[in-house]
């Protein structure tokens, strides 16, 4: 990590709490003047860490820097799990199809230790948890191998054992997915919507075991 990146880390962490807000509101929440925040944003935009526009938006370069800091901190403090919070959203129904496939089902039983309910619970993460989500991309996780059934090839899946509002399950991260980065898919031996009495918009807590 370069010296200039070290100097910007605190500023990026602060901006991560106000991402998506206009400058005036962000300045108020950060307890700084608008002029001071405009000056900081200009510097970060010149460095490529913040995008141009009326709303505060951290670029991929900025997210990568925050993820690297998070990785170092978790390693230093020997943290064995991370917590994500988000809201339940409806999916496209694809999870039920894929989880029902024999190749995936058997591998999940072997690798994760449970027979999955044929379906996934989709969670849209709150913005402040996205660095943790991106951190998972750099971890090996538990590999659910891809397979072919003679007609089609299905890609591999990376998984992490997890607890969803206390219920054991796993976060799955397919090699091929239509979901944006802020959406995670969860599998469990039970239908989580019924077991936890969840509906769209409900807040859930996911503890991911590293």
UniProtKB/Swiss-Prot annotation:
Keywords: Flavoprotein, FMN, Kinase, Magnesium, Metal-binding, Nucleotide-binding, Transferase. GO terms for biological process: FMN biosynthetic process; riboflavin biosynthetic process. Mg(2+) binds at residues 120, 122. It comes from the Archaea. Residues 1-81 are annotated as: H-T-H motif-like. Its EC number is 2.7.1.161. Residues 82-210 are annotated as: Riboflavin kinase. SUPFAM superfamilies: Riboflavin kinase-like, Winged helix' DNA-binding domain. Its cofactor is Mg(2+). Belongs to the archaeal riboflavin kinase family. This is Riboflavin kinase. It comes from Pyrobaculum aerophilum (strain ATCC 51768 / DSM 7523 / JCM 9630 / CIP 104966 / NBRC 100827 / IM2).
């Amino acid at each position: 990590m370069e010296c200039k990146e070290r100097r910007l880390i605190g500023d990026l962490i602060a901006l991560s709490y106000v991402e998506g807000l206009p400058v005036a509101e962000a300045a108020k929440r950060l307890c700084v003047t608008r002029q001071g925040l405009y000056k900081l944003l200009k510097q970060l935009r010149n460095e490529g860490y913040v995008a141009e526009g009326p709303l505060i938006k951290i670029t991929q370069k900025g997210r990568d820097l925050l993820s690297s800091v998070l990785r170092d901190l978790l390693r230093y403090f020997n943290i064995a799990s991370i917590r994500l919070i988000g809201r339940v959203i409806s999916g496209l129904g694809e999870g039920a199809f894929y989880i029902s496939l024999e190749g995936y089902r058997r591998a999940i039983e072997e690798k994760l230790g449970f027979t999955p309910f044929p379906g996934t619970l989709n969670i849209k993460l709150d913005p402040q948890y996205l660095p943790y989500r991106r951190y998972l991309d750099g971890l090996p996780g538990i590999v659910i191998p891809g397979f072919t059934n003679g007609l089609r090839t299905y890609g591999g899946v990376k998984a992490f054992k997890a607890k969803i509002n206390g219920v054991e399950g796993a976060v799955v991260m397919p090699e091929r997915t239509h979901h944006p980065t802020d959406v995670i898919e969860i599998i469990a031996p039970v239908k989580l919507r019924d077991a936890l009495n969840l509906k769209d918009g409900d807040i859930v807590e996911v503890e991911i075991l590293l």
